[in-house]
């Protein structure tokens, strides 16, 4: 019902043009976040959790609402949640957005300003995650665990460190971590990602993008396989050399 009868006690699904104009206009929090041109994601908490407005400004969020849910991601959210700092790291979370205070040693308050939410401006805090990691990184070791439930148990541990180990479902071959390896994302878009890597040894690269088996291929190396990592991310076995 788009425009219900006045006596029906239902609200109209239509939005006033003035509200839409403000919705699509930058507020103080949006402007602050856009100053950071690195690749990162945010975690909105509380009443902001289902907010989708961020996408209008190309700000990536690990929350939001969509009726069609990716099974692996939704399962992780329900089974593990966001209480593990390691999970926030692997999801490339850099900022926590909340209308409340967040007294936690892992997060620093870096900005307070107005955010347009639920048709009004609200004072909102932006906390920076001290231990945020890049969108793409080499992990020190790989651990083979086929069972999803056991993977969830490992991800739930407070000492889980995505830089130290990556959980995979099948063997990928020998890897030898070398801290001198380099990885750089030269292009990113929803349907194409270009990555430049240089490594003196065979290593395992984790890309903080959601794993989905269909529709993706490594165009420069069609024989390389994309592996599910930590249940929901993508991983590649990278041979020594520059690629």
What are the functions of these language-model segments?
Residues 2-93, 126-174, 213, 223-224:
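Extracytoplasmic/lumenal acceptor-recognition loop(s) of multi-pass membrane glycoenzymes
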Residues 63, 161-243:
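Active-site-proximal, structured, solvent-exposed surfaces of multi-pass membrane proteins
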Residues 45-48, 98-101, 210:
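Structural motif
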Residues 37, 52, 89-91, 120, ...:
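Short, surface-exposed loop/turn motifs at beta-strand boundaries within globular domains
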Residues 80-117, 130:
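Periplasmic/luminal catalytic loop of GT-C fold multi-pass membrane glycosyltransferases
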Residues 55-62, 105-124:
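Active-site regions of enzymes building and remodeling cell-envelope glycoconjugates
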Residues 28-33, 82-88, 113-116, 181-184, ...:
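Generic recognition of flexible, low-complexity loop/linker segments
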């Amino acid at each position: 019902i788009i425009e219900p009868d006045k006596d029906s006690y239902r609200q109209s699904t239509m939005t006033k043009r003035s509200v839409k104009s403000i919705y699509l206009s930058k507020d103080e929090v949006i402007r602050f976040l856009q100053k950071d041109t690195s690749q990162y994601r945010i975690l909105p908490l509380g009443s902001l959790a289902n907010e989708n407005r961020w996408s209008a400004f190309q700000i990536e969020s690990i929350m939001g609402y969509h009726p069609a849910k990716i099974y692996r991601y939704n399962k992780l959210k329900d089974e593990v949640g966001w209480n593990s700092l390691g999970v926030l790291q692997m999801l490339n979370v850099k900022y926590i957005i909340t209308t409340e205070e967040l007294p936690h040693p892992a997060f620093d308050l870096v900005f307070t300003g107005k955010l347009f939410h639920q048709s009004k401006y609200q004072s909102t805090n932006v906390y920076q995650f001290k231990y945020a990691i890049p969108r793409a990184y080499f992990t020190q070791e790989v651990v083979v665990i086929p069972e999803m439930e056991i993977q969830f148990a490992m991800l739930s541990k407070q000492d889980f460190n995505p830089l130290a180990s990556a959980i995979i479902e099948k063997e990928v071959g020998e890897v030898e971590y070398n801290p001198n390896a380099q990885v750089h994302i030269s292009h990113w878009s929803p349907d194409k990602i270009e990555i430049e890597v240089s490594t003196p040894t065979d290593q395992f690269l984790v890309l903080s993008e959601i794993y989905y088996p269909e529709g993706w291929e490594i165009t420069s190396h069609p024989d390389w396989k994309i592996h599910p990592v930590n249940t929901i991310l993508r991983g590649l076995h990278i041979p020594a050399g520059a690629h």
